[in-house]
From Swiss-Prot:
This is 2-dehydro-3-deoxyphosphooctonate aldolase. Its main location: cytoplasm. The keyword Transferase applies. SUPFAM superfamilies: Aldolase. Keywords: Cytoplasm, Lipopolysaccharide biosynthesis, Transferase. It is found in: Cytoplasm. One of its GO terms (molecular function) is 3-deoxy-8-phosphooctulonate synthase activity. It comes from Coxiella burnetii (strain Dugway 5J108-111).
Length: 280
């Protein structure tokens, strides 16, 4: 299934596209700098790009952790990025988010992994009519996403993506099963792989999550070789000082060489026709 986002199409057999940006809006300056650099990199690589940043991280480990600037200031900043840099925007929404207000600004709505089984929420987000990126819960088998997608499609909105972001494996740990990407393709939706949250160690630092950043390229390459429509990566100029998800964010300065590799892998896989639409 092909899906129009801004001025490009995404799909399982289309060239790899990128969703990237900082985990949370820390400041207007940082967001503009990161978005500008990512636009420059993706233009050089001729890679479709959607900028991602959150105005409210509602599921932080601690109530003392930074959540973001809030919806009013956050949407103002995201709208500036969109208009100034002319890039499409994706941001996550929650059960208490005024959805139409967000949908009026961004190009894609994203549902958090923890909320993928909340039927009313999924239907409400899909009913906005915008493209939706549904993140698969860490607790969910990949074949269960067919039912989640069906809930969204029931609203009449077929512009649905599904995003793999790892599986809970014991306490404070996630693993990635690349077979899941082939299974998720059976939904007929564009499949996204979240290479940075997949290396997260949820709650690993007690009051915050840890992460194994060094494995981001390993999983990103593996997922691209397995066959995906897009790659999702949170990035920051100085991940060790990021206000959210720093341990699993990929350094902005290292984005271009990694994306160059992923682009070449994607070409090999798709030109050879390796993307099975069924696991049968």
């Amino acid at each position: 299934m092909l899906m129009q986002i801004a001025d490009f199409e995404i799909g399982l057999n289309n060239p790899l596209f990128l969703i990237a940006g900082p985990c949370v809006i820390e400041s207007e300056a940082l967001v503009m700098d990161v978005a500008g650099e990512l636009k420059s990199i993706t233009q050089q690589l001729d890679m479709p790009f959607i900028f991602k940043a959150s105005f409210d991280k509602a599921n932080r480990s601690s109530h003392l952790s930074y959540r973001g600037p809030g919806i009013e200031k956050g949407l103002t900043i995201l709208e500036k990025v969109k208009k100034t840099l002319e890039v499409p925007i994706i941001t996550d929404v929650h059960e208490d988010t005024p959805l139409q207000e967000v949908a009026a600004v961004v190009d894609v709505l994203q549902t958090p992994a923890f909320l993928c089984r909340q039927s009313n929420f999924i239907r409400s987000v899909a009913a906005c009519g915008k493209p939706v990126n549904i993140k698969k819960g860490q607790f969910l088998a990949p074949w269960e996403m067919k039912q989640v997608v069906a809930k969204a499609w029931a609203t009449g909105n077929k512009k649905i993506m599904v995003c793999e972001r790892g599986y809970s494996f014991g306490y404070n740990n996630l693993i990635s099963d690349m077979r899941a990407l082939a299974i998720l393709r059976e939904t007929a939706c564009p499949v996204i792989f979240d290479a940075t949250h997949s290396v997260q160690l949820p709650g690993g630092h007690g009051t915050s999550s840890g992460g194994q950043r060094k494995f981001v390229p390993v999983l990103a390459r593996a997922a691209t070789a397995a066959g995906i429509a897009g790659i999702f990566m949170e990035t920051h100029p100085d991940p060790d000082r990021a206000l959210s998800d720093g341990p699993n964010s990929w350094p902005l300065a290292k984005m271009q060489p990694l994306l160059e590799t992923l682009k070449e892998l994607d070409k090999v896989v798709k030109n050879a026709g390796f993307l099975e639409q069924s696991s049968e």
